[in-house]
């Protein structure tokens, strides 16, 4: 089946991959892992996981808006963090952006992400 690609200037890909894809005629949107990059490609919040989490959620929001939805459409997120002790700050940032029901969520602690300044990455599945 063919699929469509969702792109947004708020969350530009920096390599040869897709920000989000959806099967033609379907409602499920698969969003690639978002990191704390702004629209200009600058890392936001070096050393500050809460600032990075806020930027990541803004990037997710931008992808969802480009697909015709918003954060309320997220059904599942997977969060990758590099330090377990950062989880409370990430959870606090998550609580600031979600109104009402939270999506299903998985937390995974990893040794590192693809750039040493990134402290977290979040991917998602939404129904839009």
Regions found by a protein language model. Give the residues of each.
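N-terminal presequence-like segments and the immediate start of the first folded domain
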Residues: 1-58, 62-75, 81-128
